[in-house]
Amino acid sequence: MELVAVKDDQVVGLIDIEYDTEEEKVVSEEEKGGMIWHLAVHPDFQGQGIGKALMERAVEEAIKQNLEILEVWTRDAGNSADWFEKNSYRKVDEYYHLYLSDEDMAHSVQPGDKALHPLYMFAEYTGKDIEQFDSIERKYKCMCYIRNL
């Protein structure tokens, strides 16, 4: 499902949701659901209820499709986590994205093969001891939110 918000002939927001099908499950929970891949409102139009209106319309459509939940993953940047909680979502999971630079790699990654020279690394950390990565500049908490319909 793709919905757009238009104001004065200009697209100012959008939401994109993929539904579970018989052939493919897109949400992590057992219930039949939809994954919100994108929800965006143009910065000049934020704070006017456009995102909430898009979400509520998407919920109406999801219910018509007999979905039981909506799932979304977001990073801790900005206020998106608070926004989802205020809009009836609950956090069910989290992990971290780690981006290691050459310098980070030199201090933390020791390949067994001396001919292997990693230059850059992306990793997902699902453990609980994130403090061990305090020296890594680029790390982001990724959070999963679920809304029951």
Regions found by a protein language model. Name each.
Residues 41, 47-62, 85-86:
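Conserved acetyl-CoA-binding loop-helix of GNAT-fold acetyltransferases
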Residues 37, 42, 46, 75:
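Residue-level recognition of the GNAT/N-acetyltransferase active site
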Residues 73, 90-139:
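Conserved catalytic-core motifs of GNAT/GCN5-like acyltransferases
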Residues 29-31:
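Short, flexible, mixed-charge acidic loops at enzyme active sites
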Residues 62-75:
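Conserved GNAT acetyl-CoA-binding A-motif
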Residues 146-149:
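Short beta-strand-to-coil "C-cap" segments at the C-terminal boundary of structured domains/repeats
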Residues 55, 78-80, 97-103:
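Short glycine/proline-centered loop/turn elements that form peptide/ligand docking sites
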Residues 4, 10-26, 35-40:
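Conserved beta-strand in the GNAT
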